């Protein structure tokens, strides 16, 4: 509808379009975005012919699982700070990635509202508020599209959340499989990280609460930088069950397999705050420290750990730990050992541990313990050594318990008794073994240890009766086993 044919006439435009190839249409209104067909669009626009930059209207687009509504200065975004209000809905971030000609991961449904303005070769969304499943975000996002010089699309974002849940950024199949008992401890699901190679990203992020697997965190802070195909998460910090968590991650996606450097530290985990709804005997006391460092290559978690180098250690300080407590994901290997290293704990719903150290050095996917698995419990002292093949997940650990005097267990009844912790990480099994068979296996080391460690002499088991503190001695052996590797955690002495 036109007021007249004069250049100053007002107009009112209503337009509906269905298109199999909508690039030219969308490019006319929003040149920084592309949409795959088929597309349905509705446009309403009002203004004057000689003042087209002041024309205002509404654009509704529906295409391939993405719905976008733009309100405001449709013809002049980017000029004189003209802005558009935006509302966007899609069933996955991956579809949103196609909207901006970039690769983004799968996710739960997405809803975004904000104010958009043009900025050079890109757009800026101010006062952005968006939800991904149960996770909420607010802040500002800048998107710079692929330019003529071949530079990658870039995203700069400053975001905060009241709540974040990692499962909102997983596929339905991944979320469903997480609820099933795993046949294998380490996932062989292929890592899909094309978005790291395809985009440059700088993200500053804070969350009041965050859930990642079994991790329930508070006050999460991180800076993520993706540049030239490399992802760097520089010291993620959060509070978790009273402990301070620090995580760093470097991942090179420019090559296959991916090159990964990972560090995880949890200091002062309070056992009383560890549980997530389990009914166990109270009170629970004590603290646990955990540290894991890994370097490896692979296209799945299984491939990465199969040839990884590094170490993993847990230090326990005077703790009552429930045997059936739900376990934090990165520490489950250590807790699998803790669950089975004390054969006399089955009758009790909690571990009464005065001190403990569970330490492994990891070389080429083999986790070795040179008598660096030690527990001093109420009834018994335990020393163990052996190996875990992270590629096959097979466990071969020798366990020697010794009853503590005056605590109701006959020292004679334990004389010469050894146990073998076998099976796999997903299904560990403890079996009693004769001293002759077990000591022969430990002495030869051929079946259990292939790294050339010769310190597993059978006499070390007999040192359990030494006057020294079993935890302190195990800590000294772990320092030696690491051979100069940085180890910042120390066990409580006595």
Locations of regions flagged by a protein language model:
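Solvent-exposed beta-strand/coil patches in large extracellular/periplasmic or lumenal scaffold regions
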Residues: 1, 28-31, 39-73, 91, ...
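Extended amphipathic ligand-handling, pore-lining, and cofactor/metal-binding catalytic surfaces
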Residues: 314, 437-438
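Short hydrophobic membrane-inserting alpha-helices and related fusion/pore-forming segments
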Residues: 440-463
């Amino acid at each position: 509808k036109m007021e007249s044919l004069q250049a100053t006439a007002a107009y009112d435009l209503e337009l509906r379009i269905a298109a199999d190839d909508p690039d030219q249409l969308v490019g006319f209104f929003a040149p920084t975005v592309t949409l795959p067909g088929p597309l349905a669009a509705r446009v309403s626009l009002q203004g004057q012919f000689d003042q087209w930059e002041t024309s205002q209207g509404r654009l509704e687009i529906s295409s391939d699982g993405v719905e976008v509504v733009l309100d405001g200065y449709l013809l002049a975004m980017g000029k004189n700070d003209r802005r558009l209000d935006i509302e966007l809905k899609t069933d996955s971030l991956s579809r949103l990635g196609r909207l901006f000609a970039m690769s983004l991961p799968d996710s739960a449904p997405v809803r975004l509202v904000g104010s958009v303005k043009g900025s050079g070769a890109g757009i800026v969304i101010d006062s952005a508020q968006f939800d991904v499943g149960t996770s909420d975000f607010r802040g500002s996002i800048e998107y710079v599209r692929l330019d003529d010089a071949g530079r990658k699309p870039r995203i700069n974002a400053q975001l905060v959340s009241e709540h974040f849940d990692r499962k909102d950024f997983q596929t339905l199949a991944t979320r469903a499989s997480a609820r099933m008992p795993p046949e294998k401890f380490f996932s062989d699901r292929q890592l899909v990280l094309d978005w790291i190679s395809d985009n440059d990203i700088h993200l500053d992020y804070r969350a009041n609460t965050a859930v990642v697997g079994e991790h329930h965190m508070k006050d999460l802070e991180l800076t993520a930088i993706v540049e030239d195909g490399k992802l760097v998460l520089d010291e993620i910090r959060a509070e978790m069950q009273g402990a301070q968590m620090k995580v760093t991650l470097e991942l090179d996606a420019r090559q296959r397999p991916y090159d990964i450097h990972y560090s995880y530290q949890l200091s002062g985990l309070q056992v009383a705050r560890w549980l997530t709804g389990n009914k166990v005997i109270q009170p629970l006391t004590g603290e646990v420290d955990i540290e894991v460092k890994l370097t490896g290559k692979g296209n799945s978690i299984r491939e990465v750990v199969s040839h990884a180098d590094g170490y993993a250690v847990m230090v326990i300080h005077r703790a009552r730990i429930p045997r059936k407590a739900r376990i934090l994901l990165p520490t489950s290997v250590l807790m699998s050992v803790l669950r089975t290293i004390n054969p006399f704990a089955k009758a009790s719903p909690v571990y009464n541990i005065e001190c403990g150290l569970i330490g492994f050095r990891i070389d080429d996917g083999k986790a070795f313990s040179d008598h660096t698995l030690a527990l001093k419990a109420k009834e018994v002292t335990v020393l163990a050594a052996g190996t875990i093949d992270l590629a096959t997940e097979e466990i071969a650990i020798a366990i020697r318990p010794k009853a503590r005097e005056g605590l109701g267990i006959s020292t004679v009844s334990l004389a010469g008794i050894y146990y073998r912790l076998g099976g796999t990480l997903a299904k560990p099994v403890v079996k009693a073994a004769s001293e002759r068979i077990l000591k022969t296996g430990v002495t030869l080391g051929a079946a259990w240890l292939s790294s050339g460690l010769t310190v597993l002499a059978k006499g070390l088991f007999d040192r359990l009766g030494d006057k020294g503190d079993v935890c302190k001695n195990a800590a000294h052996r772990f320092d030696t086993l690491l051979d100069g590797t940085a180890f910042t955690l120390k066990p409580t002495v006595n």
